[in-house]
Each structure stands twice: as structure tokens, then as C-alpha cells.
Amino acid sequence: MGVVLARGAFRERSMLTLPDFPLPDARGRFGPYGGRYVPETLIPALEELEAAYREAKKDPAFLEELDHYLRQFAGRPTPLYHAKRLSEYWGGAQVFLKREDLLHTGAHKINNTLGQALLARRMGKRRVIAETGAGQHGVSVATVAALFGLECVVYMGEEDVRRQALNVFRMKLLGAEVRPVAAGSRTLKDATNEAIRDWITNVRTTFYILGSVVGPHPYPMMVRDFQSVIGEEVKRQSLELFGRLPDALIAAVGGGSNAIGLFAPFAYLPEGRPKLIGVEAAGEGLSTGRHAASIGAGKRGVLHGSYMYLLYDHDGQITPAHSVSAGLDYPGVGPEHSYYADAGVAEYASVTDEEALEGFKLLARLEGIIPALESAHAIAYAAKVVPEMDKDQVVVINLSGRGDKDVTEVMRLLGGEL
């Protein structure tokens, strides 16, 4: 005889809610950014998705089940950890790490994929597709597809397949089909193009689990809402640990989901908002053209169905993004980040590949934590600003993922020498 769960068995401690933020507006816009720039054939699917999401967001049964899986499967809440040795080394503010690296699958991506997979099941879709760069989103989608018994196809650029061979094997082990993409720069942009083509072809049976706060409305809103659990926890944990909100929040920004998850619960506060700092990938330097700093060195335009800051040349062609981190080499940044940048809600900086590698090594040696190369960008920028702050100030760095997936690539780049 099987175990029968009692009514309300998914409920533990506090009940999850998905916040209602002031933006986007009814047209899916954050100021001028966002919207739906897609083929007419996709509009009904996006409208269906938005309606299903808004209904699910208010359904206690959906929220209860999501809360259960976030706690019991993913491992939430994650600690807000005082990095004492790092704080002492920098000699300025007290540094706390939001430990998203401790989640199941090793990164923040699971917050979003659990939500979208439950939504796919609710909508009666049996097949899910995804794009992935570093492979973390792909692994996360393959994981939730296995959990809920969904067919899964993941698109990944050939260059990223090479850099992230371990994650490719993980996805296959979890039952997903990985389809390498040979077009263009063979990275995340090209994988996204192929995933969108698949969705257009199979829209009636397939749910596209988009991995970042990009794409057409309602994706930037939906992914932001699912990731906002990061910032909501930081709010509560900060009050418990030091009785007030932090002075600054720092997170790496590619498409921008880990950063928006941290920032959004603070961004719309009427007063007392911490300084919000997003760190883009400067790659080999902004002047070289080999970078992924869409806000720092890009222009406004449309990519993958959304109006936002992105990288393109004088002919309007998207330029290949470059970063040592496979998860940051996307040539655009989400519309809400674009809005934050223009409105002065957050500030955006960038660090080079070389600086990120130093951050990677520094955290490992001082705190015994090997960060993802994405997160290492946030560490590297913190190294510049934390020493200038007062010792009674508090900085929270979002440690969006662990670095297991990057160790082989870092070893190759450093020639095995530390």
C-alpha cells in the first residue's frame, strides 16, 4: 500500500507567495523596455501562458506545491553566510554571501525551472524545451523534467558544449536530449534562436522553459517572480541577522535572472533601498569588442522578442558576446535591468575575464567555496568597492552557483598553474 499524503501535506512553516511588483505594465513593458516582438503565430501561445501564469500565481494549491518542492527538493531557504575571512581581507564592509550555490543542481536556476515545470504540467504540456549557455539552466530543466515525467530537449551552442562537457553529460544522464547548435557564434544566443524555432513549430504540445529574464512578455515577469525568492529571503535574513537591510547588493548580470531575483524585492521600496550593483562581463576589455557588457557598451534594440540593451554593429547585426563565463556571454540584458539602468534604480559595472579568475581563486582560498565563474564576476567587483566602505556597513553578494562546472575550463585557461 502506498503512502497517502494528508490534505495540506505540502504546507511547511511559511507559505510562499509570488510578489506583485509595480512593473511590467499591462503590455509587458518596463518603461520603454520589454514587450512582445514575435511572429504572429506565437501571440496566442504567449497570451495563453500569461493567463495561465496569472491564474496559477493566485492559486493556493499551486503555490503550496511550488513551496514544497523549493524546500524539500531544491533545498530552500539558502543561508545568508557571513564571509568573515573575506571581510577581514578586504578590510571594509562586512560581506555576506547568499548561498544559491547550495541548491540542488548547484545554482539559482532551479527556483525558476520548478515554477515553470509546474506551470507546464498545469497547462497539460508534456514536452519541455530550453536553451542553455553554461549548462546550469539545461541541467535544471532536465532535472525538473525527470521529476515530473516530461519529455525534454535542450539546445546548446557547440562552443558551450565543449566548455561544459560535464553538464552535457549530466543532462543526458537525466534523460534529456541535448541538441548542439553550430550556427553563428555557437553560444547562448544561437541556442536561444533554435529553441524559439522549435517552439514555433511545436507550440501546441511544447512548453518553452526560458532560463533568464529575457524574451517576450510574460517571460521576464514570470522568471523574475520565480527568482524573487532570493531577495525576499535576504530581506528576512538580514533583519534576523543584523536588524536592518544591507547597504549594498551585488550580483553578476548576463541575461540577468540571479540579479533580478536579488534586486526586485528591494528595487521598488519607497525608502531605505540598498545600493543595487549589477556586474557585467567585460571579457577581454570593453574597448576590444570581446565582452558581454550590454548596458555598459551596448545600445537599445530588439532581440528574442524583447526591447532591451544589447550588442550589435553599425549594420544592425548582433555581435557575438564573449566571456570566460559561459553563462554571461549573452548579447543582451533583460528589460527590467535596462529600465533599472535608465531610471537609476541600480548601477551597472563590469569586470574582465582576468579579474573574474582572480575572484574565483580568492573565494576558494579565503572561504573554502569554489564559485561559479558567473558569481566570480560579482566577487571581483566587490573587491574594488568593499575596501572603500565602513566596517559597520553590510554588503550581500549573490553567490548564484557553484564552480564545479568551471574547474576544468579554469584549469585549461591557467595551464594547470595556480
UniProtKB/Swiss-Prot annotation:
Listed PANTHER family: TRYPTOPHAN SYNTHASE (PTHR48077:SF3), TRYPTOPHAN SYNTHASE-RELATED (PTHR48077)
InterPro entries linked to this entry: Trp_synth_b_CS (IPR006653), Trp_synth_beta (IPR006654), Trp_synth_beta/beta-like (IPR023026), TrpB-like_PALP (IPR001926), TrpB-like_PALP_sf (IPR036052)
The protein's name: Tryptophan synthase beta chain
Molecular-function GO term, any one: tryptophan synthase activity
Gene that this polypeptide is encoded by: trpB
Source superkingdom: Bacteria
Cofactor needs: pyridoxal 5'-phosphate
Protein EC: 4.2.1.20
NCBIfam families hit by this protein: trpB (TIGR00263)
Assembly behavior: Tetramer of two alpha and two beta chains.
N6-(pyridoxal phosphate)lysine: residues carrying this PTM: K109
Originating species: Thermus thermophilus (strain ATCC 27634 / DSM 579 / HB8)
Metabolic or biological pathway, per its Swiss-Prot or TrEMBL entry: Amino-acid biosynthesis; L-tryptophan biosynthesis; L-tryptophan from chorismate: step 5/5
Keyword field contains Cell division: no
Entry function: The beta subunit is responsible for the synthesis of L-tryptophan from indole and L-serine.
